[in-house]
């Protein structure tokens, strides 16, 4: 019988840091919850609580509207060409 994988328990980093409010201008904090293509990561991947996930989503949407972070990214900026330099 196959062994079960051991997963580390995910925890909310915002609760651990005791953050009261997530500001839309703090891009270093928001990039933790964004994928490489600047999509909002779900709770099951980041481990954030429901309360903070709602605040993060609202802050990211405000930052996008204010043009602080982009809505989308070009593919050439995300994935480099593996054949470049050969």
UniProtKB/Swiss-Prot annotation:
It comes from Campylobacter concisus (strain 13826). Keywords: Ribonucleoprotein, Ribosomal protein, RNA-binding, rRNA-binding. Part of the 30S ribosomal subunit. Forms a tight heterodimer with protein bS6. This is Small ribosomal subunit protein bS18. It holds the Pfam family Ribosomal_S18. GO terms for biological process: translation. PANTHER family: 30S RIBOSOMAL PROTEIN S18, SMALL RIBOSOMAL SUBUNIT PROTEIN BS18M. Disulfide bonds: none annotated. Belongs to the bacterial ribosomal protein bS18 family. NCBIfam families: S18 (TIGR00165). InterPro entries: Ribosomal_bS18, Ribosomal_bS18_sf. Binds as a heterodimer with protein bS6 to the central domain of the 16S rRNA, where it helps stabilize the platform of the 30S subunit. Gene3D superfamilies: Ribosomal protein S18. One of its GO terms (molecular function) is structural constituent of ribosome. GO terms for cellular component: cytosolic small ribosomal subunit.
């Amino acid at each position: 019988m196959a062994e079960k994988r051991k997963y580390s328990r995910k925890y909310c980093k915002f609760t651990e840091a005791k953050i009261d409010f997530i500001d839309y201008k703090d891009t270093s904090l928001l990039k933790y919850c964004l994928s490489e293509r600047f999509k909002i990561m779900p709770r099951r991947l980041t481990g954030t609580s429901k309360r903070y996930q709602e605040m993060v989503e609202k802050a990211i949407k405000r930052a996008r509207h204010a043009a602080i972070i982009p809505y989308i990214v070009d593919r050439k900026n995300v994935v480099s060409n593996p054949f470049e330099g050969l």
